[in-house]
Design a protein with these regions (language model features):
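Active-site-adjacent segment of FAD-dependent monooxygenases/related oxidoreductases
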Residues: 1-66, 82, 143-146, 156-162, ...
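A generic structural motif
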Residues: 11, 91-95
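Membrane-interface helix/loop caps of multi-pass membrane proteins
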Residues: 39-51, 90-92, 118-119, 180-182
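Conserved FAD-binding catalytic core of PHBH/FMO-like flavoproteins
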Residues: 62-63, 89, 107, 111-212
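A conserved short coil-to-beta-strand element within the FAD-binding core of flavoproteins
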Residues: 74-89
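Core beta-strand elements of the Rossmann-like FAD/NAD(P) dinucleotide-binding domain
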Residues: 96-107, 111
């Protein structure tokens, strides 16, 4: 929504005590030049917009599909590749049980996420700490969640407590939320964590609270 705050809040949980807040104007507030925020002074005629990839990707996908020189293959996993003097041959599996694919190309680029199999196979590495590979992301539908907070909503909420730390991002400003659950050092993988329990600790809700 145009009037939804772009703020970043820090709380003991999404519904818990607020510790601090970075105030960032909503799209509607940016029309008032007297309203200030950390990004209101950027030298650009187009102010920042908080738009999740679930809205952007269909637009980009449709544009890519309209280009005759592109072929998009979904639900396909590259398993290995071989490089020679003239290019690269990659082998992939159809995740819906179809025939294996042999793909001949000039280049292979690892753009398949933080835990990218392709990136690892070609030896490309991150710089810094690969924390992104240890974040369990869950998109939830919780239309009643905003009823449980006593303060103004925020675009991003950092949940910090001894039980679980994570982030909650507003997707549509009403009912859709992206919950990031950060794995602890001793947790070897996502299977080591009860996802539902972790989400409830980050949100600060009990077992009776319903979300999908």
């Amino acid at each position: 929504p145009h009037d939804y705050p772009h703020d970043v809040a820090y709380r003991t949980s999404f519904t818990g005590t607020e510790l601090s807040r970075i105030r960032i104007p909503s799209r509607a507030e940016r029309r008032d030049k007297s309203v200030q925020g950390p990004d209101t002074g950027w030298p650009t005629p187009e102010p920042p917009h908080r738009i999740n990839q679930i809205y952007i990707e269909p637009i980009l996908f449709a544009h890519a599909e309209s280009m005759a020189q592109l072929r998009i293959i979904c639900r396909t996993q590259v398993t290995h590749y071989e490089q020679d003097d003239t290019g690269v041959t990659a082998w992939a599996n159809d995740l819906d049980g179809g025939e294996p694919l042999r793909i001949r190309c000039d280049y292979v680029v690892g753009c398949d996420g933080g835990r990218s199999m392709v990136r690892k196979a070609i030896g490309a590495t991150f710089t810094g700490v690969d924390t992104v590979a240890r974040v369990q992301s869950t998109l939830i539908d919780a239309p009643d969640l905003l009823k449980h907070i006593a303060v103004k909503p925020a675009w991003a909420t950092f949940s910090v407590n001894p039980r679980r730390s994570g982030n909650v991002y507003a997707i549509d400003g009403h009912r859709r939320w992206l919950v990031h659950n950060y794995l602890r050092t001793e947790e070897t993988g996502f299977d080591a964590v009860n996802r539902d329990w972790a989400i409830r600790q980050i949100l600060g809700v009990d077992a009776q609270f319903h979300y999908d």
